[in-house]
């Protein structure tokens, strides 16, 4: 028995399951759908997968093999690193001074004094 969802799975008769319509090619007991549409029509997955059976080209004439237009130019390594460094500096400059990136010594001491364990250690280590 074929797995669920195969094209010629006869155990899936009912309104919820879609039948594949149109001509089919039989290979080794399995039926595969093919479409014999116009040449300028866009190709589907089945057309490209089974094009060798029908004798069609893999690409239609309306799809020329052209490079991607919007492809970004690859930057040399040094140029990319320099740009990253510039971005990092500008981000650090934009940070407000009231919120430092790392806590100062006063903030650390007040935090340690508030916690019981660190407050105990701080008292006995600073004597």
Swiss-Prot record:
A GO CC term assigned to this protein in UniProt: mitochondrion
Record-given protein name: Uncharacterized mitochondrial protein AtMg01330
Species this protein is from: Arabidopsis thaliana (Mouse-ear cress)
Subcellular location: Mitochondrion
Region Disordered, residue ranges: 1-22, 53-106
Primary location group: mitochondrion
Source superkingdom: Eukaryota
Keywords of the record: Mitochondrion
